[in-house]
């Protein structure tokens, strides 16, 4: 059997053509990613014998021609595959480069307001989708459908990939955990991570004495600032959204923020209303000569010459038609005489029914008043004898007077309760976004400025949206200061309440409601300062909430300080300079007398300034300490501010659920009174 001869060993020597080709394989400066296509592969190499004569080499090549052709075929196929791979990657990269350049151009361009509004809609749609998916996930978990729950979790994760704020916050907390403080500071200052927390706001260019308390939280694609009133803070109720800060990332890796102010539309769908065009005074006013069949509900118009806002009666009367139908639905067959239509604000049906039930229960339990039915005959008889329209009080009035104005306190409580319910607890359905700017953003403060021109332009095209204007309430505010005092005097002297007094109380309630509703608004430039919510066991350090006056509750921030009082009567001689430790109560929410941001009271603390425990407040209340201090009083509008002597009282709070209680006694020359504050703890 013949044996196959082994082919001689051959060396591969590269020709000049091959070296030129290899030089083409080196990356050039113009095209750094892909080499040029190779020429004919036959020019790559040639076969030569390492040793032996020419005859032997020629004979061996003649004997084994198939080895040369096989090597060439292998090289050809390898080069073809290599070229095809290079061409495919080059085509793919060119397509991606074109798409990427287009995306970068879109993101790098400065967005106008219309482009931002499209982004707002996209974020809202994604947020609604996330809410639906999360609710479906909860239902799937409850019914133990884990396969469906797994799919929903994947869908939630896919939707959350567009959440720029969520990525920023997760990266921020991871950087803090890994002690990468440089990255954390960058995200805090540039990406808005430092805005999360509690802030107190005070208007810089508008005289707003009330102030704001807002909490900024990180949500899908935006930071949301919600405003809270004192009642919402004490009951942990939900706040009303006030402004938003949207976040995007451009093609260069820079963060862009756009702040928007939420102007809520005054739309209350639960209250029956009618278009103003179809309302005429003849439809709901009873003429002197005849009566209309209104279901035992008669509305009279009475003029008050002393009223400052009589010009607005026509607007107020338009709202009485819906009020009539509402009362017919709530109390069938009711007999009511409305002596004057005031503007108590648009109120929720369910809330009014609760108030009516509460009043009915109180009347059944206490039997304080017996209100007689007043029959409506004509306006002439009412004008001749106005005293017949007085509401007589029974013998229980003496008990009210003996209780030192207990009924007055109850009235204040009801008014304050209504104010707090209407000022933010009722969720508003629709809002209008208007542009705003963040300025001087720091770790402890920032400014929010509204763009007035765009605000006016946007508000003109939206029905039911009104800008805040306090001119209408300023005139009525002058008459309110002594209304409750006149009411108490009327009860004490005449044992009756006149109709005029009831009108004044109605105006007071109307103004208080309007003030509470407008208190959530912003205008111009507002400065926000960070609120430190770190828990503290020191009773003289932290947040406190208390009741004050007729308007609303107050939130103060107690702070320990060392030095001298500002604006005090201390001697300015260098030899008499004395430093001491003292505590200040700064108002986070104010009132028309002492606005927000001002010091409500202060007291020097320490054994040197401590007073005996026996004082105005009995020791049974758990008095821990008493310190001599000063309280601030002022006239409406913060006119004639003055310091009066007082004392700071600290109670142990054994009988109070909220912990320690702080009180301050005002020793004013004309009267003395005390204010109590309970500890307020906000979630960080």
Swiss-Prot record:
Region (Disordered): 1-66, 278-318
Alphabetical list of InterPro entries matching this protein: EX1/2 (IPR044680), UVR_dom (IPR001943)
Domain UVR per the UniProt entry, residue ranges: 127-162
Compartments, as annotated in UniProt: Plastid, Chloroplast
GO CC terms of this entry: chloroplast; thylakoid membrane
Keyword vocabulary terms for this entry: Chloroplast, Plastid, Stress response, Transit peptide
Residues of the transit peptide: 1-46
Bias type Acidic residues, positions: 301-318
Polar residues: bias regions: 1-31
Induction: Down-regulated by H(2)O(2).
Biased composition (Low complexity): 48-61
Gene Ontology terms: biological process: singlet oxygen-mediated programmed cell death
Domain of life: Eukaryota
Pfam families per UniProt: Cyclin_D1_bind, UVR
Function: Together with EX2, enables higher plants to perceive singlet oxygen as a stress signal in plastid that activates a genetically determined nuclear stress response program which triggers a programmed cell death (PCD). This transfer of singlet oxygen-induced stress-related signals from the plastid to the nucleus that triggers genetically controlled PCD pathway is unique to photosynthetic eukaryotes and operates under mild stress conditions, impeding photosystem II (PSII) without causing photooxidative damage of the plant.
PANTHER family: PROTEIN EXECUTER 1, CHLOROPLASTIC
Name of the protein: Protein EXECUTER 1, chloroplastic
